[in-house]
A protein has these predicted regions:
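Glycine-rich phosphate/adenosyl-contacting loop at the front of the ribokinase-like
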Residues: 1-64, 71-73
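Conserved N-terminal subdomain of the carbohydrate kinase-like
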Residues: 28-36, 54-136
Length: 137
Protein backbone atom coordinates (compact mmCIF):
# COMPACT_ATOMS: atom_id res chain seq x y z
CA UNK A 1 0.00 0.00 0.00
CA UNK A 2 1.35 3.42 -0.94
CA UNK A 3 1.20 6.04 1.79
CA UNK A 4 2.02 9.73 1.94
CA UNK A 5 3.46 9.70 5.45
CA UNK A 6 4.74 7.15 7.97
CA UNK A 7 4.53 8.11 11.63
CA UNK A 8 6.42 6.38 14.39
CA UNK A 9 6.08 6.60 18.14
CA UNK A 10 4.16 5.12 21.02
CA UNK A 11 0.42 4.64 21.14
CA UNK A 12 -1.43 5.44 24.34
CA UNK A 13 -4.83 4.66 25.77
CA UNK A 14 -5.13 7.87 27.81
CA UNK A 15 -7.28 8.17 30.92
CA UNK A 16 -7.74 11.68 32.29
CA UNK A 17 -8.34 11.67 36.03
CA UNK A 18 -9.14 14.92 37.79
CA UNK A 19 -8.64 14.92 41.55
CA UNK A 20 -9.98 17.33 44.16
CA UNK A 21 -6.73 17.78 46.08
CA UNK A 22 -3.05 17.42 45.19
CA UNK A 23 -1.86 13.81 45.25
CA UNK A 24 0.05 13.06 48.44
CA UNK A 25 1.47 9.81 49.76
CA UNK A 26 -0.71 8.40 52.53
CA UNK A 27 -3.79 10.44 51.62
CA UNK A 28 -6.80 9.73 49.43
CA UNK A 29 -7.71 12.21 46.69
CA UNK A 30 -11.27 12.09 45.41
CA UNK A 31 -11.77 11.76 41.65
CA UNK A 32 -14.01 14.57 40.40
CA UNK A 33 -14.67 13.64 36.76
CA UNK A 34 -17.05 10.78 36.03
CA UNK A 35 -15.39 10.40 32.59
CA UNK A 36 -12.24 9.10 34.35
CA UNK A 37 -12.57 5.62 32.84
CA UNK A 38 -13.10 6.89 29.27
CA UNK A 39 -10.25 6.10 26.89
CA UNK A 40 -8.83 8.93 24.80
CA UNK A 41 -6.86 7.29 21.98
CA UNK A 42 -3.54 8.95 21.50
CA UNK A 43 0.16 9.11 21.33
CA UNK A 44 1.68 11.76 19.04
CA UNK A 45 2.23 9.45 16.07
CA UNK A 46 -1.37 8.21 16.25
CA UNK A 47 -2.75 11.75 16.54
CA UNK A 48 -0.71 12.93 13.54
CA UNK A 49 -1.68 9.95 11.36
CA UNK A 50 -5.35 10.25 12.32
CA UNK A 51 -5.48 13.99 11.58
CA UNK A 52 -3.72 13.61 8.22
CA UNK A 53 -6.08 10.81 7.20
CA UNK A 54 -9.07 12.96 8.12
CA UNK A 55 -7.60 15.64 5.82
CA UNK A 56 -7.48 13.18 2.92
CA UNK A 57 -3.85 12.03 3.06
CA UNK A 58 -2.73 8.45 3.61
CA UNK A 59 -0.73 8.45 6.83
CA UNK A 60 0.23 5.16 8.44
CA UNK A 61 1.43 4.77 12.02
CA UNK A 62 4.14 2.19 12.69
CA UNK A 63 3.58 0.87 16.21
CA UNK A 64 2.83 -2.11 18.43
CA UNK A 65 -0.46 -2.85 20.18
CA UNK A 66 -1.49 -5.49 22.69
CA UNK A 67 -3.99 -8.30 22.60
CA UNK A 68 -6.65 -5.81 23.75
CA UNK A 69 -6.36 -3.84 20.48
CA UNK A 70 -9.92 -4.65 19.42
CA UNK A 71 -11.65 -4.91 22.80
CA UNK A 72 -10.46 -1.46 23.93
CA UNK A 73 -11.92 0.12 20.78
CA UNK A 74 -8.61 1.29 19.31
CA UNK A 75 -8.93 -0.74 16.10
CA UNK A 76 -12.42 0.65 15.47
CA UNK A 77 -11.16 4.19 16.17
CA UNK A 78 -8.48 3.79 13.49
CA UNK A 79 -10.93 2.25 11.02
CA UNK A 80 -13.38 5.12 11.50
CA UNK A 81 -10.56 7.58 10.77
CA UNK A 82 -9.50 5.62 7.64
CA UNK A 83 -6.06 5.11 9.17
CA UNK A 84 -4.13 2.28 7.44
CA UNK A 85 -3.19 -0.48 9.87
CA UNK A 86 -0.54 -2.30 7.83
CA UNK A 87 2.21 -0.83 10.07
CA UNK A 88 0.68 -2.19 13.27
CA UNK A 89 2.16 -5.24 14.99
CA UNK A 90 0.09 -6.98 17.64
CA UNK A 91 1.76 -8.50 20.72
CA UNK A 92 -1.06 -10.84 21.80
CA UNK A 93 0.24 -11.61 25.30
CA UNK A 94 0.72 -7.93 26.20
CA UNK A 95 -1.59 -4.93 26.74
CA UNK A 96 -1.63 -1.80 24.61
CA UNK A 97 0.18 1.13 26.25
CA UNK A 98 -1.88 2.94 28.88
CA UNK A 99 -1.44 6.40 30.35
CA UNK A 100 -3.13 7.80 33.45
CA UNK A 101 -3.02 11.60 33.57
CA UNK A 102 -3.81 12.95 37.03
CA UNK A 103 -4.70 16.63 37.29
CA UNK A 104 -5.45 18.39 40.56
CA UNK A 105 -7.41 21.59 41.16
CA UNK A 106 -4.15 23.60 40.88
CA UNK A 107 -3.71 22.24 37.32
CA UNK A 108 -0.63 20.31 38.42
CA UNK A 109 -0.17 17.00 36.60
CA UNK A 110 1.20 13.56 37.33
CA UNK A 111 1.59 11.15 34.42
CA UNK A 112 1.66 7.40 34.99
CA UNK A 113 2.54 5.31 31.93
CA UNK A 114 2.54 1.57 31.27
CA UNK A 115 4.46 0.91 28.02
CA UNK A 116 2.89 -2.50 27.38
CA UNK A 117 3.39 -3.60 23.76
CA UNK A 118 5.53 -0.51 23.06
CA UNK A 119 8.13 -1.62 25.62
CA UNK A 120 11.61 -1.86 24.10
CA UNK A 121 11.79 -5.60 24.74
CA UNK A 122 9.27 -6.09 21.90
CA UNK A 123 11.20 -3.94 19.42
CA UNK A 124 12.11 -5.57 16.15
CA UNK A 125 13.47 -4.57 12.78
CA UNK A 126 10.89 -2.84 10.64
CA UNK A 127 10.09 -4.16 7.19
CA UNK A 128 11.81 -2.29 4.36
CA UNK A 129 8.55 -2.44 2.42
CA UNK A 130 7.02 0.07 4.84
CA UNK A 131 9.56 2.68 3.78
CA UNK A 132 9.64 1.76 0.09
CA UNK A 133 5.98 2.68 -0.33
CA UNK A 134 6.04 5.92 1.69
CA UNK A 135 6.58 9.40 0.28
CA UNK A 136 7.62 10.79 3.66
CA UNK A 137 8.58 9.09 6.90
Amino acid sequence: MKVDVLTSGYVSMDHIIKIATPAKVGFTSLVTNKSNSKIFYGGCSVNIAYALCRLGMKAMPVLRVGGDYESNGFKKFLEEGNVPQDGITQIAEEATSVCYLLQDNNNDHITIFYPGAMDGRYAQKMKDSLFETAKLG
